[in-house]
Amino acid sequence: MRIVDVAETTKPIASPIRNAYIDFTKMTTSLVAVVTDVVRDGRRVVGYGFNSNGRYGQGGLIRERFRNRILEAEPRSLLDDQRTNLDPHRIWAAMMANEKPGGHGERSVAVGTLDMAIWDAVAKIAGKPLFRLLAEKKGRRPIRVSSSMRRVVITTRARIIRRSRPRCAVISAAATMWSR
């Protein structure tokens, strides 16, 4: 079991909408496909991800740094302990090799886009919807989510966390946080 390709394409959102901060008419988004050699129901398993609007596509970072690190890693080093699925945490460690610690906004968009595609592939290999796969993980972890543009209200397993006017923007891969 291994990742055989990571494909990225940058596409325009081309939407005539805008808000108080952003005009989306020239905004782009990255679309990512993490292609594996696993076959389910006669079809190759491919995980898909995209970055949200409000940030531009990050094709350069994905294609020039992160894709290469994933594909150059020893395939077995990216598998879980049972060798039955990909391990998103090990893949994340491989793609972040030689990166300076810290958030660094545009990089987090690229990594989050890949993270989404990796988790999609993991769920497909497991034969489960992603929400079920994540729900099987034991324990709770606090998640910090904030935004500089709006008030954030997050429902976390029947607990509501409210933050009024957070000071910094943090992009976090919730799937990774829940599964640890």
Region spans (language model):
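Short alpha-helical segments and helix-capping/turn motifs at coil-helix boundaries
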Residues: 16-19, 117, 164
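Metal-dependent enolase-superfamily TIM-barrel catalytic cores that perform enediolate-based chemistry
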Residues: 139-180
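Conserved structural scaffold segments of CAZyme catalytic domains across common CAZy folds
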Residues: 108-132, 139, 146-147, 151-152, ...
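Metal- or metallocofactor-binding catalytic centers and their adjacent structured scaffolds
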Residues: 39-126
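A short, structural micro-pattern
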Residues: 26-28, 63, 142
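N-terminal amphipathic alpha-helix/helix-capping segment at the start of soluble metabolic enzymes
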Residues: 1-8, 19-23, 93-95, 99-102, ...
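Structured beta-strand/loop patches that form or line metal/cofactor-binding pockets in enzymes
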Residues: 1-59
